[in-house]
Amino acid sequence: MSIRIIPQDELGSSEKRTADMIPPLLFPRLKNVYNRRAERLRELAENNPLGDYLRFAALIAHAQEVVLYDHPLEMDLTARIKEANDQGKPPLDIHVLPRDKHWQKLLHSLIAELKPEMNGPALAVIENLEKASEQELEQMASALFASDFASVSSDKAPFIWAALSLYWAQMASLIPGKARAEYGEARQYCPVCGSMPVSSMVQIGTTQGLRYLHCNLCETEWHVVRVKCSNCEQSRDLHYWSLENEQAAVKAESCGDCGTYLKILYQEKDPKVEAVADDLASLVLDARMEQEGFARSSINPFLFPGEGE
């Protein structure tokens, strides 16, 4: 991997002197992630053919905000950071890190928060999850992390992922130390947890003009240079697609080398764009990319593939 997190006690003067350079990682700022996402989803739901589903996703994002403050996480990750650094692995690697029962507590709290807002099939889904055993929930979590989407129904997956994401984001926000970029690439996966991005964003503010990929699990953002495929790192056959015009705030970056695409959002075109919400609200663009023969290189946390997809 090309971005490592250095334990705090190993930071030397060389790391401290690079403070004015491009930040390789932006850890999640949980104070505004979920509220902002919920607000953006509700805003995008207006005059959108997917309006009902966007409002449904907004309910989940709002519930995540409530549960975040009802169930804070206290955890010392110092030893974990050091061990992962020695191994050259992401510190919160989804394929290695043991899960404790905190994530299931978050899931049941999310269900309790959402139940009064749900009806019909959605209510039946969360009631089914409410009755599931700890072992069944762990099996579903492991299947999602292994990209075994056929083993978890696409209507249950967003709720399971919402709890896992909240748990991983809480852990990511507690990481002590500092990220350091190293030679080499291999940045298609999150350097913190090893999950995939949901989309990428060209930012404004202190990171003006820089592109960051946004993790679909732990909410961390990591820097990847522009005009380079985020999946295979080639740059010779990239194209940009939109349903509006060249000034569109949401585009798809396609790569002819690997045949995939990832959404790229531009804050300078619309400061309100949000990595998850704007990706979900632009599924018409996904349909166009599929027609053009490109496969999506990311997963939106509110939209998982069903069996056979």
UniProtKB/Swiss-Prot annotation:
It comes from the Bacteria. One of its GO terms (molecular function) is ferric iron binding. Pfam families: FdhE_C, FdhE_central, FdhE_N. It is found in: Cytoplasm. The keyword ATP-binding does not apply. InterPro entries: FdhE-like_sf, FdhE_C, FdhE_central, FdhE_N, Formate_DH_accessory. Keywords: Cytoplasm. One of its GO terms (biological process) is protein maturation. The keyword Nucleus does not apply. GO terms for cellular component: cytosol. Disulfide bonds: none annotated. Belongs to the FdhE family. Necessary for formate dehydrogenase activity. PANTHER family: PROTEIN FDHE. This is Protein FdhE.
